Structure formats: C-alpha cells, structure tokens
Amino acid sequence: FKDPRVRLAFSFQSKYLGMSPFRCPSLFTILSFLEYEHGVFHPRGGCGAVSQAMARATEKLGARIHLNEPVEEILFEGRKAVGVRSKSGIRPCDALVVNADFAHAMSHLVPNPLRKRWTDEKLEKKKFSCSTFMMYLGLEGRMDDLAHHTIYLADDYRRNLRDIEDDHVLTAQPSFYVQNPTVTDPGMAPEGMSSLYVLVPVTHQHDNVDWARETKAFRKVVVEQLEKVGIDDLDQRIRYEKILTPALWESEQSIYKGATFNLAHTWGQMLSRRPHNRFEDLESVYLVGGGTHPGSGLPVIFESAKITSQLIEEDARKVKKTTFLPSRSGDAGEVDRAWGSAATMQSSTLGKPASGSLSKTA
C-alpha cells in the first residue's frame, strides 16, 4: 500500500497491544487480517457477560467465587506457594493462579528475595506499554448515526505516538476509540439512552504528567476531539460519567505504572521471554493475563487461561502418582492441610448477569 491512510488502516491494530504500528513486530500484522477477514463480534451484555458465563460454568463444576476479598499476602514454604491471606483469613492452596496485574502482584505480594528473574529491580528496567485515559459515559438520547466502533487517528499520528512512547507528555491532538454498543445491543443502556466507552491512548505513569492537575484540561481536549466525529452537545447530554487516568489505573485498579496493556510486546519481551504461565520463579504458582504468554488483549488473555489450565491439569496428574505428601511448616503451619483445595486471586468484579450470545458488529 502506498497511501499512508490505507497503511494505517491495516496497522493501527497494534494499539490493541498498546504499541506503535511503526515499532510493533510484523508478526502482529495478522491482527488486521483476522479483523477484516473474520469480522468483530460483540457479546450481548458486553464483554463482562463472557466473564459471567464463565463464572456460572465454573460454579456448576463446584467452584466457589469470592468477590470483594483482596489478597493481602501469598504464603510460602520456601519457594512454594501454600496459601493466601485475605481479610477473612487464610485460604490454603495446592496451586495458586495469579490473574492480577503481573508486575503489581510480584512487587506487592511476593517477597523480592524469592524471585530471581523478575525481581523489583529487573521489573523496573522492563519496557511497559502505554496507558489509557478512559471515559465511561451514560448519555441522554440515542446515537444511532454513530457506528458501534469508531477509531479516530490524529492528523500527525507519528507525533501523537512519539508524545506517548518517547516524550511521555500529553498530546494536543490525541487519537481515540469510541464504542457505541447500543446500536448493536440496546440492552447496554436504558431505553432512550446511550452508553459510550471512550479510550484515549496516553503515556503510562510518568513524572512528566501530573494527572491531579491535568485531568480536567485533558478531558476538555478529548471532548473537542469527539465533536470531530459528530458527537455534539456532549456535556449537556451526560447523565453518568466515570473517568480513569493512568494514575487511577495504578491506585484504584492495581495496574503497575498504569500500563493497561502490561509488559510491552517488544522482541525482548515476547513469547518465551514473557513470564511463563507455569511461573518460573516460584513453585505451584501459575499466571494468566496480559503479563504472561501469549500477551495482552482479551481474546489472547483467554488463550493464556486455557494454556495455564492445561498446565495445572498436567501437573495435578503427576502429583496423583505420588504416594507421599511431605508435611508443611512455617507459614504453611497456619494453612489447613486438606488436600484438593485451591486459591485464585480475583482481579476483577463481575457485574449483573447477562446472556452470553454474540452479535457481529460493524
């Protein structure tokens, strides 16, 4: 392709990984093929409906899900995880699955001396993705002329990306993505209303940007950008608004540096060079999420969960072949020794139930 606009149309998908299309490994050009060849699907009830469907399926299989119970500490015997401590007490485990943000979980829940490859010092030197400035809006009136997905790229897209990834400053003309799900799924808002999801790529947490001071002004810039795609009188129509900045991603959602796409997908941090699903620094600890293999993005994260569950099953079969289980001591002395228990770190809250059907979107 010679036209730069067409080139961007077939490469901007790298932002799904939080990366610049001018630097992203060419492996990820497959994303544009998948999108244009097979289309994009919307789960009725939103992406949260997928999590809810999974929750119902696991509960039918006997799992118990504990929400609003943050894990305060992972308990170890040597390098082996034997349980977690939460506000309600200690929960023992034979296998621990960490689906919290990887770097945050390591730096807050795992003692630094227990880690070899992923120490605090090494994490600080890793390259992390950009962050996002988010606006979740409930609007008066329908917006049937606005497509389900709208992507606006800044006129000077290279400059926009340089501001984000190199200079770590706020750009005067940001790119953005808007989702208007009610045109496909009317149940995503009350009758006669619309819900909008606005995502603006920005730098991850950096000393150059003080979000306590900049949020109001940057919101104004974003609203002005939204007017360019025909969203007029926005402030007058807003009935609900929630904003998330990189600072809030870090403080409220426990995302390391507010880097919403986790470790950057550079050649040095891809595939086997990411933290392994069977975590290499600890025993009986498994990872899922954007920080492990294969990488970030919801479909890919689901694949990481599939990989991890298969590894747990393989390891459990090996354990069943043994005839002797050693006694536990230290922190493990507080842990109930009942065999077969499991602990899962829950990093998200499930919303109200919704159907799990899919609709193809434009």
Predicted regions and their residues:
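A glycine-rich dinucleotide-binding beta-alpha-beta segment and adjacent secondary-structure elements
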Residues: D3-G18, T171-Q179, D232-P294
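Mid-domain catalytic core of redox enzymes
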Residues: E72-P190, P326-G330, T344, G351
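Conserved redox-cofactor binding core of oxidoreductases
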Residues: F1-Q52
